[in-house]
Amino acid sequence: CLYGLLLKSANEVANGLAEHVSGRVEAFASLMNQRARELGCTGTNFVNPNGLNNSNHYTTARDMAFIAKAAFDNEIVRQVASTLTYQIPATKNAAARTVTMGHKMINPADSRYYEGVIGGKTGYTSLAGNTLVTCAEKNGKRLIAVIMKSSSSHYADTKALLDYGFALGQNESGARWQQ
């Protein structure tokens, strides 16, 4: 399920997981909001698990960075979010199929590849535009870049943020994770 969710943004998987865990999408969104608050998020309200447009569903880049940090602290999430392709096994209702990672900075064969990226998630809605969350690590320093409402420069903007972050000295205040 996580491969479909993180590699292909399979909204039906997000809804299915929510219903499996909480019985209802709304109940799961409540759990998401509770966890977001625990992580220090102050500008986030979830109403669904897939991020599709809803006027009451919103977040900030800062909050998304807090959420991404918690996610990338999980080894399973890092493994799934860094997978280039995954074959979903056949079921009684569907043949086996392959899903491919949408985040271009992970793929060494792509011109947007960025050395050190250990995972990430793409997104797009008409309200949010292109969104990109990227986790990268170099020389023991882990950074998270969050881009929202981009028309087309989300990869270039992410590269610029990561380049800037990695260029900061170890003792500079911007080089450490701060809440």
Identify what each model region corresponds to:
Residues C1-L7, A29:
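Signal peptide-directed extracytoplasmic domains
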Residues L7-H20, V47:
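Substrate-binding clefts and substrate-entry loops adjacent to catalytic sites
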